[in-house]
């Protein structure tokens, strides 16, 4: 996890707020470092984590986790981490050659119109039996992949609403979801993605949006992060700040716009 980011957001593994839905998004930049931050953050907090890895293998997240000081392998072996490896389980789901829990969760790959009930049941069964672990946490990297697989934005938003009602409201846990906005998306895909992002922004309590610098590439500044906070359940976002950042091998640095040594 990144101590500087914890300081900016006034959070720590010992004092984080339960019941929050955190939305991560990016454009012309890579917000994956935030996924790794929150994965290590909640594992350090002792939470039961259900991680839907739809774009990378378990070994990728494990290697990054090692650099951040957490062992995903140990967390999975002791039951603290439930990891759905989408790249691996999707093959069995499509070919119907595997009936494991992971492939059943991805049954929508065979029939996208069937919806995401199987995926929700996987999340529900993974987190409702948290045992002695801390509050349950759902992390998804990245949700927008489902659009490219033929699932409608409406079906995805229904899925997140069910997850939020179960994880955040009923179980008083947290959710972290990443969505990506690619410049080269087709018109239909872009329309679905815009609908998905608007719906998720309406649902979430905290939004972190990563994008490239307006001035272009800079070796010492990798991008900027816009942060929106919402205080109450039905309130509009009442606080907004922009920070610039640089990602390191074992962390990230954050600073107010214009205060980096690269621009002074």
From Swiss-Prot:
Compartments where found: Cytoplasm; Nucleus
Major localization class: cytoplasm
Record-level GO BP terms: positive regulation of cell migration; tRNA wobble uridine modification
A Pfam family reported for this protein in Swiss-Prot or TrEMBL: ELP6
One cellular component term from this protein's GO annotations in UniProt: cytoplasm
Lineage top rank: taxon: Eukaryota
Xref: InterPro entries: ELP6, P-loop_NTPase
Record keywords, A-Z: Cytoplasm, Nucleus, tRNA processing
Functional pathway: tRNA modification; 5-methoxycarbonylmethyl-2-thiouridine-tRNA biosynthesis
Subunit field text: Component of the elongator complex.
Cited function: Component of the elongator complex which is required for multiple tRNA modifications, including mcm5U (5-methoxycarbonylmethyl uridine), mcm5s2U (5-methoxycarbonylmethyl-2-thiouridine), and ncm5U (5-carbamoylmethyl uridine). The elongator complex catalyzes formation of carboxymethyluridine in the wobble base at position 34 in tRNAs.
Family: Belongs to the ELP6 family.
Protein name, entry field: Elongator complex protein 6
């Amino acid at each position: 996890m990144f101590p500087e980011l914890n300081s900016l957001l006034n959070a720590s593994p010992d004092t984080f707020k339960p019941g929050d839905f955190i939305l991560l998004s990016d454009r012309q930049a890579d917000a994956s470092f935030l996924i790794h931050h929150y994965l290590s953050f909640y594992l350090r907090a002792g939470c039961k984590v259900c991680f839907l890895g739809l774009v990378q293998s378990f070994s990728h997240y494990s290697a990054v986790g090692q650099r951040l000081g957490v062992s995903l392998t140990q967390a999975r072996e002791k039951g603290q981490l439930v990891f759905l490896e989408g790249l691996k389980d999707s093959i069995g789901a499509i070919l119907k050659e595997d009936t494991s829990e992971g492939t059943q969760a991805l049954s929508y790959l065979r029939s996208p119109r069937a919806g995401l009930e199987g995926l929700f049941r996987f999340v529900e069964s993974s987190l409702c039996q948290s045992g002695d672990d801390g509050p349950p946490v759902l992390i998804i990297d990245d949700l927008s992949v489902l659009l490219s697989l033929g699932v409608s934005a409406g079906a995805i938003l229904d899925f997140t609403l069910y997850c939020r009602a179960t994880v955040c409201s009923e179980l008083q846990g947290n959710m972290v979801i990443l969505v990506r906005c690619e410049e080269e998306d087709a018109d239909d895909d872009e329309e679905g993605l815009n609908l998905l992002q608007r719906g998720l922004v309406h649902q979430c309590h905290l939004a972190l949006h990563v994008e490239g610098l307006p001035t272009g590439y800079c070796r010492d500044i990798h991008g900027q992060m816009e942060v929106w906070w919402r205080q109450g359940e039905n309130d509009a976002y009442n606080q907004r700040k922009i920070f610039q950042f640089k990602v390191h091998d074992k962390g990230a640095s954050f600073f107010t716009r214009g205060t980096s040594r690269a621009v002074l």
